[in-house]
Amino acid sequence: MYEIKRIFSKNIIVLCIVAIILNIIVYTGMQLNGMTLGEFRKREILSEETDDIQIKKQTAYIKGYNKYIADVIDNSEEMKNRKIFSSKTRYSYNNIIVTQREYEKMRGITLAQENNKSLESYLEYENTSIVVMLLLIIIIFNMFRERNNSMWIQVYSSKNGRTRLMLRRIGTIFVGTFILNFVANISVFVTSVILYGKNANMNSYIQNLMMFKDFTYPISKFQYVTLLYICQIFVCFTLSLLVFSLFAYTRKRVTASLIIGLICSVEWLIYNTSSKGTVINQLKAYNILNIIACNSILSRHNTLSIFGIVEKDI
C-alpha cells in the first residue's frame, strides 16, 4: 500500500487530472473548429434538418452494403481460380481464402440509418490512448526515484526484495492502465454526447458507421466499444511492461528516457518519410501510434503471414 501511495503521489494524481482535462479541451476544440459552443449547437440543429448530402450518402452506403460484401466474395472466388493465384502455398492465394471466409460472415446483415455522430466522433479521436500512454511512462519514471539515492541497494539486496517490488509495481501499472483508460475514454465519450446528442441504438451493428465497412465481425456498437477498451488496456499494459523492463535494466532513468525518445523518433521518421511501395512503408499500418490507438487497426480488414500461415491480423 505504501508503494502505491508513493507512486501515485498527489503530484502524479494532479498531473493525470490535468492531462485528462486538457485532452477533453483538445477534443472539444477539434470538434468546434473555431466556433463557439452556441454556434456549434446551432449548426448541428440546422444540419439535422438540412444535411441532405450526408443523409443521401448514408442511405447509399446502407443500400449498397450487402452488394459490396457480395462483390468482395465474388471477386475473391474469381481471383482464386486464376492461374497467377493458383499456388496454394503462396501468400496471395491464402490471403484470398481468408478474405473470402471473413467477408462471408457479413452476408445478409441488416443496417439502419441512424444518428451516430457522437460515437463516430469519439472513435475518430485517437489522442486519448496516447495521453494515457504518456502518463504511464511518467508514472513508471516516478517508480524508479530510488535510483537517485542508495535506497535501491537495500531493497534489492534484501530477501526476495527485488521480486516483491517488481510484482507490486507490475500490479500498480495494470491498475493504473485500467483506471486511466477508463476515466480518459469515458470523459471523451460523455463530451461527444454533450456536443452531438445521444447516440442511436448501441445494440445495432457497428457496420452502421461507414468507417466500419471492412470490419468483418458482426457485433454491436456497444460490443465494439467494449472490445476497443479491452484492446487499449492490453496494448497500453504491454507497452508499459516494455518501458518498465527498460527502466529496470538501465541504471539511470535519463538513459531509459533517451532510448524511448530515440525509438519514438525513428518511428516518426519511418511514418513520415518512407515512400509508397517500399517494405518499410508497410510498417505504417502497424506503427506505434496506430497500435496504441487500436481503432485504426481494428476497424479495417487486413491479413498477416506468420510462418507461412495467413490469418486476419486481429
Labelled PLM ranges:
Residues 156-162:
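Short helix-to-coil transition segments within interhelical loops
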Residues 151, 162, 166-167:
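Alpha-helical transmembrane segments and their immediate interhelical loop/hinge regions
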Residues 23-53, 57, 72, 95-146, ...:
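Secretory targeting signals
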Residues 17-19, 254-267, 285-286:
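Central hydrophobic cores of alpha-helical transmembrane segments
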Residues 1-16, 20, 167-169:
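Aromatic- and glycine-rich beta-strand/loop motifs that create alpha-glucan
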Residues 62, 68-106:
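Membrane topogenic helices and adjacent juxtamembrane segments
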Residues 273-287, 303-313:
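Extracellular/periplasmic helix-loop-helix junctions in multi-pass membrane proteins
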